[in-house]
């Protein structure tokens, strides 16, 4: 029998950990996943009902339902031939030479399913957040991240072997000749990319990935392709700069993307087209297409046809479904109460910043200014992005609709470049069980789906709600002041607003946070403190501020507060999935999230009478306080 004083996570969640079962089609179960399962069930019923009673007064939802019905028409899917896929494959197969590839870059971006072996993106400019910038990065890797390619990684060989076999089977389904050779060649190109790819640790420090280069310099360094013409075709103008997010890839560009490697690049593109098409046809192909992902995370079985139908519809109509969900399931009373909690949390933060002992008054005042400028969005957005009015289902096949949608979405990506950034837009649908802070707009967003038990309920006590959604709200506020967010000002621009000595003190705090988690063992391996530092700063800030707010309520119950905190992090997962998270997830493993932050809070020791001999004890001089 565990005790809270030795293991908060295991004690509070003992019954759940014993009884909870990981669904056969998922790699884990958690408080978040339980809500996802509930939402899936509700939405599947809702969309089935709407299929019988079409929402003709809501054109975007109507198109979503038409697509949903097409995704669920298994008779048509079983009969559908592969001519459209073969047509996509032919767009690459007919590129006989590297010269052919060079001459068709624009066509490939806008009118094919073939990904280029490099990527341009349109994102808010980190130093001018009201305008968009053109970003440049590599094409990504086949395995989850760079660490999987180390020869000592226990799963490297089996994953690459499985991917090759699975991919060649998919290629053969589409009558591609030399399928095994193509899969092997794709892996050879993938292996060439590894040294130049960003590590997960590098991606985690996103504020440090902003490397602007004048467009003239950017294009002149690349000799093998005419990127100047491509950029003009993409954004219909010549930007003054390109933001390079993967430096090593840019430096290695000509040694990777060249005539000598063309056969490997071509094979890589063919595998991407083939794998991407598997979701749109018969059941056997759908199962085959998901096999590698299931093997990677040790998932026992494929998603059911009904869940797949919903997944596919969400992949194109996420905000449409989210807005429907938010309006149906999220009430005004809940919205008002959560808004009250957000306001309370911001006030707590203001008070804590004004009393902060390690910041100068000047930096603390600027931090409070940034805090005051944070805009919260709760529940669901007021309107849909305009792009959804362009997605129209046709009389063609499911795959043909997807091709058309992809073309429209790609065109929209680059069309945005000449517009101002809409800082009120949501980057997460309302039915997603999550929340986020956006540094470029200085906004915090709480979708309707997370605003339910165990995170939040009007039936829960104030302490339970502060231990649940309160810590999530304060966590997102804390991201404005984590190692990345702290580098952005109140307008959302990457801008040094700290005094040097204050930022140096903050960097020391970051090092302490890294040390607090680094190497801590879990059942799947040790935690990487550098990878998870930003989320750990947010977790610590979140629980600290929410605790302060909970204590201001008349019905305060700190046992309930800490217990609820432990409940929201409950999780069980396959070992393979946990190992993948350890290598690439910016969040700490669930048990560490539940157990480590409370040990930095005096109230935890007082509430549960934690002694020096207890496993949860941390000496006062080692208790870390940041915000």
Curated annotation (Swiss-Prot):
Cofactor note: Binds 1 zinc ion per subunit.
Keyword presence, Transferase: no
pH dependence: Optimum pH is 6.0-6.5.
Keyword list, A-Z: Cytoplasm, Hydrolase, Metal-binding, Metalloprotease, Plasmid, Protease, Zinc
List of catalytic residues: 476, 539
Domain of life of the organism encoding this protein: Bacteria
UniProt subcellular location: Cytoplasm
GO biological process, one term: protein processing
The EC number(s) this enzyme carries: 3.4.24.-
Gene Ontology CC terms, in alphabetical order: cytoplasm; plasma membrane
Cofactor(s) required, per the database record: Zn(2+)
Coarse class of the protein's main subcellular location: cytoplasm
Binding site for Zn(2+): 475, 479, 535
InterPro entries recorded: MetalloPept_cat_dom_sf, Peptidase_M13, Peptidase_M13_C, Peptidase_M13_dom_2, Peptidase_M13_N
GO molecular function, one term: metal ion binding
Enzyme class: hydrolase
Pfam families assigned to the protein according to its UniProt record, in alphabetical order: Peptidase_M13, Peptidase_M13_N
Residue ranges constituting the Peptidase M13 domain according to the UniProt record: 1-627
Alphabetized PANTHER family for the sequence: FI17812P1-RELATED, ZINC METALLOPROTEASE FAMILY M13 NEPRILYSIN-RELATED
Subunit annotation: Monomer.
Free-text function comment from the UniProt entry: Endopeptidase with broad substrate specificity for several oligopeptides.
This protein's name: Neutral endopeptidase
Organism: Lactococcus lactis subsp. cremoris (strain SK11)
Lineage, uppermost ranks: Bacteria, Bacillati, Bacillota, Bacilli, Lactobacillales
């Amino acid at each position: 029998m565990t005790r809270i004083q030795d293991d908060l996570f295991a004690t509070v969640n003992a019954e759940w950990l014993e009884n909870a079962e990981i669904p056969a089609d998922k790699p884990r179960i958690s408080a978040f996943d339980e809500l996802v399962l509930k939402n899936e069930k509700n939405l599947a019923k809702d969309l089935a009902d709407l299929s019988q009673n079409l929402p003709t007064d809501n054109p975007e939802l109507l198109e979503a339902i038409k697509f949903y019905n097409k995704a669920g028409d298994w008779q048509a899917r079983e009969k559908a031939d592969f001519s459209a896929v073969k047509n996509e494959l032919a767009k690459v197969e007919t590129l006989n030479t590297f010269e052919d590839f060079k001459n068709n870059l624009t066509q490939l971006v806008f009118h094919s399913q073939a990904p280029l072996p490099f990527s341009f993106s349109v994102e808010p400019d980190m130093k001018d957040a009201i305008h968009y910038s053109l970003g440049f990065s590599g094409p990504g890797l086949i395995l989850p991240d760079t660490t999987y390619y180390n020869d000592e990684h226990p799963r490297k060989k089996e994953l690459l072997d499985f991917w090759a076999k699975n991919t060649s089977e998919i290629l053969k389904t589409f009558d591609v000749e030399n399928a095994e050779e193509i899969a092997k060649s794709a892996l050879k190109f993938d292996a060439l990319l590894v040294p130049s790819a960003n590590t997960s640790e590098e991606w985690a420090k996103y504020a440090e990935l902003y490397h602007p280069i004048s467009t003239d310099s950017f294009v002149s360094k690349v000799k093998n392709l005419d990127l100047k013409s491509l950029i003009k075709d993409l954004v219909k103008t010549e930007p003054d700069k390109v933001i390079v997010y993967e430096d090593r890839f840019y430096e290695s560009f000509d040694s990777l993307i060249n005539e000598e490697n063309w056969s490997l690049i071509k094979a890589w593109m063919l595998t991407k087209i083939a794998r991407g098409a598997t979701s749109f046809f018969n059941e056997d192909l759908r199962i085959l297409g998901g096999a590698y992902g299931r093997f990677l995370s040790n998932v026992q079985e494929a998603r059911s046809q009904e869940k797949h139908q919903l997944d596919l519809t969400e992949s194109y109509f996420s905000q449409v479904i989210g807005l429907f969900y938010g309006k149906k399931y999220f009430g005004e009373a809940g919205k008002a109460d959560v808004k009250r909690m957000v306001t309370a949390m911001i006030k707590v933060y203001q008070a804590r910043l004004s009393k902060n002992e390690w910041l100068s008054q000047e930096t603390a005042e600027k931090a409070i200014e940034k805090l005051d400028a944070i805009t919260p969005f709760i529940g669901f957005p007021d309107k849909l992005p305009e792009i959804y009015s362009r997605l129209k289902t046709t009389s063609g096949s499911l795959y043909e609709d997807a091709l058309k949608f992809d073309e429209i979405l790609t065109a929209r990506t680059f069309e945005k470049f000449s517009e101002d950034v809409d800082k009120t837009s949501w980057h997460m649908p309302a039915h997603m069980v999550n929340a986020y802070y956006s540094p470029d707009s200085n906004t915090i967003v709480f979708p309707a789906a997370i605003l339910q038990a165990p995170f939040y309920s009007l039936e829960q006590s104030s302490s339970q709600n502060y231990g649940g959604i309160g810590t999530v709200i304060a966590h997102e506020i804390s991201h404005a002041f984590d190692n990345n967010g702290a580098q952005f000002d109140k307008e959302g621009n990457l801008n040094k607003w700290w005094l040097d000595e204050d930022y140096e003190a903050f960097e020391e705090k970051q090092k302490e946070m890294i040390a607090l988690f680094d190497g801590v063992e879990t059942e799947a391996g040790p935690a990487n403190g550098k990878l998870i530092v930003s989320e750990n700063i947010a977790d610590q800030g979140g629980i600290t501020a929410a605790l302060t707010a909970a204590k201001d309520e008349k019905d305060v119950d700190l046992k309930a507060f800490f217990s609820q905190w432990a409940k929201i992090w409950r999780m069980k997962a396959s070992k393979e999935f946990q190992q993948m998270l350890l290598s690439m997830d910016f969040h700490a493993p669930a048990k560490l999230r539940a157990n480590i932050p409370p040990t930095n809070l005096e109230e935890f020791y007082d509430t549960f009478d934690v002694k020096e001999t207890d496993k949860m004890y941390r000496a006062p001089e080692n208790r870390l306080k940041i915000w």
